[in-house]
Amino acid sequence: MKEIDIDTLISKIPNKYILTVVISRRARQLFEELKILKTVARDPLILAMEEVAQDKITYGEGSDSED
């Protein structure tokens, strides 16, 4: 498994608090998807961090879609 460098994540999303929220929300989404599919996969938290590091996840201020 490739190690995820925190500096890489911070370079993608400079605010550590926003970074934490983005990663945790994505990890929850992945967990729910895996639960529905009943798939055993890697840790959703690690997957979410990898997605941020690979620029697969972006965020925008004011784009909070929590209902």
UniProtKB/Swiss-Prot annotation:
Biological-process GO terms, alphabetical: DNA-templated transcription
Enzyme Commission designation: 2.7.7.6
Keyword Transcription: yes
One Gene Ontology cellular component annotation held by this UniProt entry: DNA-directed RNA polymerase complex
Pfam families noted in UniProt: RNA_pol_Rpb6
EC class: transferase
Keywords: DNA-directed RNA polymerase, Nucleotidyltransferase, Transcription, Transferase
Reactions catalysed according to its record: RNA(n) + a ribonucleoside 5'-triphosphate = RNA(n+1) + diphosphate
MF GO annotations: DNA binding; DNA-directed RNA polymerase activity
Protein task: Promotes RNA polymerase assembly. Latches the N- and C-terminal regions of the beta' subunit thereby facilitating its interaction with the beta and alpha subunits.
Family to which the UniProt record says this protein belongs: Belongs to the RNA polymerase subunit omega family.
HAMAP family with a match to the protein in the record: RNApol_bact_RpoZ
Assembly information from the UniProt record: The RNAP catalytic core consists of 2 alpha, 1 beta, 1 beta' and 1 omega subunit. When a sigma factor is associated with the core the holoenzyme is formed, which can initiate transcription.
Protein's name according to its UniProt entry: DNA-directed RNA polymerase subunit omega
Gene responsible for this protein: rpoZ
